[in-house]
Amino acid sequence: MSEPSEKKQKVATSSLEQLKKAGTHVVADSGDFEAISKYEPQDSTTNPSLILAASKLEKYARFIDAAVEYGRKHGKTDHEKIENAMDKILVEFGTQILKVVPGRVSTEVDARLSFDKKATVKKALHIIKLYKDAGVPKERVLIKIASTWEGIQAARELEVKHGIHCNMTLLFSFTQAVACAEANVTLISPFVGRIMDFYKALSGKDYTAETDPGVLSVKKIYSYYKRHGYATEVMAASFRNLDELKALAGIDNMTLPLNLLEQLYESTDPIENKLNSESAKEEGVEKVSFINDEPHFRYVLNEDQMATEKLSDGIRKFSADIEALYKLVEEKM
């Protein structure tokens, strides 16, 4: 009888449980839905890279096959059939994930549409329709969109006109974050680790959690949102280590890959609340605006070398994985 008791005690005092008690919703960043249940996350996020990786696992072959079969029956041209099958793959994985998590799943719009507002809206509506057909209400789905000018405007339309919740990804700058809040999007995913990667490569020096540029960027955004009363949730993403994570404990949401979830699960190191909305209201900068001024948004974003390069790089990488998924489906079609 002692073994179950010991296990229960470990889970109760794990760093993962402490993070949850600090007020942060823990989100699993993975398409491998069988692997995430162990950590009992509130939500789950996916992206083209994660879906591509999961699609190659033999245990999930049946979902790919089902999506390919769907594609064969929907579409006039081969291209349309493949595109429909790819959307169905996203929804197949999302639907399975929602059987594991009690909250929401984030499903990403094709990154190749990052500079096309109209096409992004159309794709998002199609994904939501596929979820509806699968019995999943739109309230449980976050549509992930790259935080380009066009992406933010697409999310604005989806939220206001269609009541579709959006998760703005590839967000590397304060400028992007301000525009997203003004667009009344449901949630943003500011990146931590990729920002640190850029400055580490540029300067050649290591950073502590206190000096980490990615951590400081997310703190600034969080404080700005709370100070000015924006309802948009902040979900820190792209972590490189536990120190970055600990420095942001208390933030609204945190999306974590399986390796970091496992480290938190196995660790009993203390995690204390570092962020809270009340203290954040005392910090931050004065209110600024970008949402209705495209030239100003583009200029300020362009002045930020890191954000410009990382946004571009992120879109290229996600697009490459979409192309790889396209070829995988094409071969099966």
Swiss-Prot record:
<keyword id="KW-0808">Transferase</keyword>
<comment type="similarity">
    <text>Belongs to the transaldolase family. Type 1 subfamily.</text>
</comment>
<dbReference type="GO" id="GO:0005975">
    <property type="term" value="P:carbohydrate metabolic process"/>
</dbReference>
<dbReference type="GO" id="GO:0004801">
    <property type="term" value="F:transaldolase activity"/>
</dbReference>
<comment type="function">
    <text>Transaldolase is important for the balance of metabolites in the pentose-phosphate pathway.</text>
</comment>
<dbReference type="InterPro" id="IPR013785">
    <property type="entry name" value="Aldolase_TIM"/>
</dbReference>
<dbReference type="Pfam" id="PF00923">
    <property type="entry name" value="TAL_FSA"/>
</dbReference>
<comment type="pathway">
    <text>Carbohydrate degradation; pentose phosphate pathway; D-glyceraldehyde 3-phosphate and beta-D-fructose 6-phosphate from D-ribose 5-phosphate and D-xylulose 5-phosphate (non-oxidative stage): step 2/3.</text>
</comment>
<keyword id="KW-0570">Pentose shunt</keyword>
<dbReference type="GO" id="GO:0005737">
    <property type="term" value="C:cytoplasm"/>
</dbReference>
<comment type="subunit">
    <text>Homodimer.</text>
</comment>
<dbReference type="GO" id="GO:0005634">
    <property type="term" value="C:nucleus"/>
</dbReference>
<feature type="active site" description="Schiff-base intermediate with substrate">
    <location>
        <position position="144"/>
    </location>
</feature>
<protein>
    <recommendedName>
        <fullName>Transaldolase NQM1</fullName>
        <ecNumber>2.2.1.2</ecNumber>
    </recommendedName>
</protein>
<dbReference type="InterPro" id="IPR004730">
    <property type="entry name" value="Transaldolase_1"/>
</dbReference>
<dbReference type="GO" id="GO:0009052">
    <property type="term" value="P:pentose-phosphate shunt, non-oxidative branch"/>
</dbReference>
<dbReference type="InterPro" id="IPR001585">
    <property type="entry name" value="TAL/FSA"/>
</dbReference>
<keyword id="KW-0704">Schiff base</keyword>
<dbReference type="InterPro" id="IPR018225">
    <property type="entry name" value="Transaldolase_AS"/>
</dbReference>
<dbReference type="GO" id="GO:0034599">
    <property type="term" value="P:cellular response to oxidative stress"/>
</dbReference>
